[in-house]
Swiss-Prot record:
Excises uracil residues from the DNA which can arise as a result of misincorporation of dUMP residues by DNA polymerase or due to deamination of cytosine. InterPro entries: UDG_fam1 (IPR002043), Ura-DNA_Glyclase_AS (IPR018085), Uracil-DNA_glycosylase-like (IPR005122), Uracil-DNA_glycosylase-like_sf (IPR036895). This is Uracil-DNA glycosylase. Keywords: Cytoplasm, DNA damage, DNA repair, Hydrolase. It is found in: Cytoplasm. It comes from the Bacteria. The gene is ung. It comes from Borrelia recurrentis (strain A1). GO terms for cellular component: cytoplasm. The lineage of its organism: Bacteria, Pseudomonadati, Spirochaetota, Spirochaetia, Spirochaetales.
Length: 223
């Protein structure tokens, strides 16, 4: 079936788009947007924003989230990211705090992480849509099957990618990744409830930049 997505991703995922579960997923999502109007996030054109912003071969880092923000106007299709006119959520505030601590730089007070994506950071939510005010409302419609395949495809076809797995949900994806050719960094989730259990002080961003340098890759400006 035809899916509007960046061309290199379309090639990598074409067999996935033809599977029964994905066709059922698309049918469900279309009906959700039709019947619930503006209460499904992100807007339809941004569902695959993480893919459209970053061609497959340019991935250097994967940061895995769970599902989109469920408040109006927040989600923009990139994990942990919000639109630039939206107040920075607590988890992202802690991410910026850890960057400033470990890299000794001042982050830009803007929650739109498109600037990271354009440099090679794949900001992937495991579940790509959500209903307003109902976190994890779309967790069982097929998105996890799809994004698990995405992770496996990245692991198989690319080399020396950094995977940042924050929290138990993300850590559960470790089994999908070839640890012999990629760097996996694990710690607690940056949420205020768990950031002090390892995330703050993890040095994930400095470790990432060092790994990219060691493998002769252009580093990422995480400001």
């Amino acid at each position: 079936m035809e899916v509007k997505i960046e061309e290199s991703w379309k090639e990598m995922l074409k067999s996935e788009f033809c599977k029964g579960y994905f066709k059922r997923l698309v049918s469900f999502i279309k009906n959700e947007y039709k019947t619930k109007k503006d209460k499904i996030f992100p807007p339809p054109r941004l569902i695959f924003n993480a893919f459209d912003t970053l061609p497959f071969k340019d991935i250097k880092v994967v940061i895995l989230g769970q599902d989109p923000y469920h408040g109006k106007g927040q989600a923009n299709g990139l994990a942990f990211s919000v639109n630039s006119d939206i107040k920075i959520p607590p988890s992202l505030q802690n991410i910026f705090k850890e960057i400033e601590r470990s890299l000794k730089i001042k982050t830009i007070p803007n929650g739109d992480l498109t600037r990271w994506a354009e440099q090679g950071t794949f900001l992937l939510n495991s579940i790509l849509t959500v209903e307003e005010g109902r976190p994890s409302s779309h967790k069982d419609i097929g998105w996890k099957i799809f994004t698990n395949e995405v992770i496996k495809i990245i692991s198989k076809n690319l080399n020396n990618v950094v995977f940042m797995l924050w929290g138990n949900f993300a850590k559960g994806k470790k089994k999908l990744i070839d640890t012999s050719k990629h760097l996996i960094l694990e710690t607690s989730h940056p949420s205020p409830y768990s950031a002090h259990n390892g995330f703050l002080g993890s040095n994930h961003f400095s470790k990432t930049l060092r790994y990219l340098q060691e493998h002769n890759k252009t580093t990422i400006n995480f400001q």
